[in-house]
């Protein structure tokens, strides 16, 4: 309420552009720049820079990292003509920063544009209060066992719905293709879905939706966790189930293309697991609606498999499949990139496994 009267003040033609980027630890950073007019395209936005030594993206003696605008979204917090700018990180020698995985992913998406690959990602997350207690949980104790919370309704069954609703509206305002929300199996855990999105826009929109979630949660004094197993014990983990289809899969007779894709995924199980999120071994145990991290499996309507084919898809003979292995803390550029590489084919100047290793190397 205190801030609202200032947000209503005229800006006299100025436009505020909040540049956001991904740091060395898959955290989101941002800073704001004043523009003298509203940009009509990415090309109208200036390149900017930041201190990469403060985000573990560059050494102190050569710390400038450049922000190259990649996508523009309306700003639901400042509103008006103000915008949020998703930016890629580049080094001063003209090479992509080693934590800039968007660049490699975009190469693959462009090379396989004719496949018209669609993704839909189910982002799960857990909410904690300022004392790091799960929202709604008894202080120093535990709620009743899992059962009544999934898609629950009513006090004691769902928690922090106001945060979820605010985030939903913020995404819609910003043009994020958010397709739904639901309370999850563990209390204080929620899910939202983004998609279907084509190509590189999937990862762009998921990162933007995460930024919006953190910003909304700030206003409620709530911390957002994307850890795949935030609480030990008989509680579900958190994933980023990734739904995938190509044009040929979505057409009548597409099941043969889905089955061919699953065979390719089986052959690269270890490579995919390597990019499917840190601490994913704590989640992929074969329990709590997951498959085992050490083996690949697939099945119709089976949520204990690596790859699930929805019952409706099996019945109709075409559609999409769901990869249930990705953890909630994935970098979607790595996941959608390696998925495209595996099912559509590799290209000479991009390798998502090597791209992952590049980000894990010591030094700059």
Curated annotation (Swiss-Prot):
InterPro entries, per database record: Gln_synt_N, Gln_synt_N_sf, Gln_synth/guanido_kin_cat_dom, Gln_synth_cat_dom, Gln_synth_gly_rich_site, Gln_synth_N_conserv_site, Glutamine_Synthetase
GO-annotated biological processes: glutamine biosynthetic process
Main location as per UniProt: cytoplasm
Gene Ontology molecular function: ATP binding; glutamine synthetase activity
Pfam families per the UniProt record, alphabetical: Gln-synt_C, Gln-synt_N
Reaction(s) this enzyme catalyzes, per UniProt: L-glutamate + NH4(+) + ATP = L-glutamine + ADP + phosphate + H(+)
Subunit and interaction comment: Homooctamer.
Similarity comment: Belongs to the glutamine synthetase family.
Protein name stated in the entry: Glutamine synthetase
Source lineage: Eukaryota, Fungi, Dikarya, Ascomycota, Saccharomycotina
């Amino acid at each position: 309420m205190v801030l609202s009267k200032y947000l209503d003040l005229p800006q006299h033609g100025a436009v505020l552009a909040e540049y956001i980027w991904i740091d060395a630890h898959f955290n989101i950073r941002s800073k704001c720049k004043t523009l003298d007019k509203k940009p009509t395209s990415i090309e109208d936005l200036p390149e900017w820079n930041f201190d990469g030594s403060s985000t573990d993206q560059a050494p102190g003696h050569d710390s400038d990292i450049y922000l190259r605008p990649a996508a523009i979204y309306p700003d639901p917090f400042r509103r008006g003509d103000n915008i949020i700018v998703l930016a890629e990180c580049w080094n001063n020698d003209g090479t992509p920063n080693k934590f800039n995985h968007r660049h490699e992913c975009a190469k693959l998406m462009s090379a396989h544009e004719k496949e018209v690959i669609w993704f839909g990602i189910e982002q799960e997350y857990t909410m904690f209060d300022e004392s790091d207690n799960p929202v709604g949980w008894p202080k120093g104790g535990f709620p009743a066992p899992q059962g009544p919370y999934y898609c629950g309704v009513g006090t004691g069954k769902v928690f922090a719905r106001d945060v979820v609703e605010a985030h939903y509206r913020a995404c819609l305002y910003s043009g994020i293709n958010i397709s739904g929300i639901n309370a999850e199996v563990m209390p204080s855990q929620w899910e939202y879905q983004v998609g279907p999105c084509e190509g590189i826009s999937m990862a762009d929109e998921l990162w933007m939706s995460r930024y919006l979630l953190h910003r909304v949660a700030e206003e409620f004094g709530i911390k957002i966790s994307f850890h795949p197993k935030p609480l030990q014990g008989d509680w579900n983990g958190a994933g980023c189930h990734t739904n995938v289809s190509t044009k040929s899969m979505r057409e009548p007779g597409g099941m043969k293309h889905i089955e061919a894709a699953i065979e390719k995924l089986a052959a690269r199980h270890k490579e995919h697991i390597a990019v499917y999120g840190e601490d994913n071994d704590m989640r992929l145990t074969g329990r709590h609606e997951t498959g085992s991290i050490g083996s690949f499996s697939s099945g119709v309507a089976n949520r204990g498999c690596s790859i699930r084919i929805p019952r409706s898809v099996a019945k109709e003979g075409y559609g999409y499949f769901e990869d249930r292995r990705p953890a909630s803390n994935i970098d979607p550029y790595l996941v959608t990139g390696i998925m495209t590489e595996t099912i559509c084919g590799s290209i000479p100047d991009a390798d998502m496994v090597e791209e992952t290793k590049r980000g894990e190397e010591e030094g700059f």
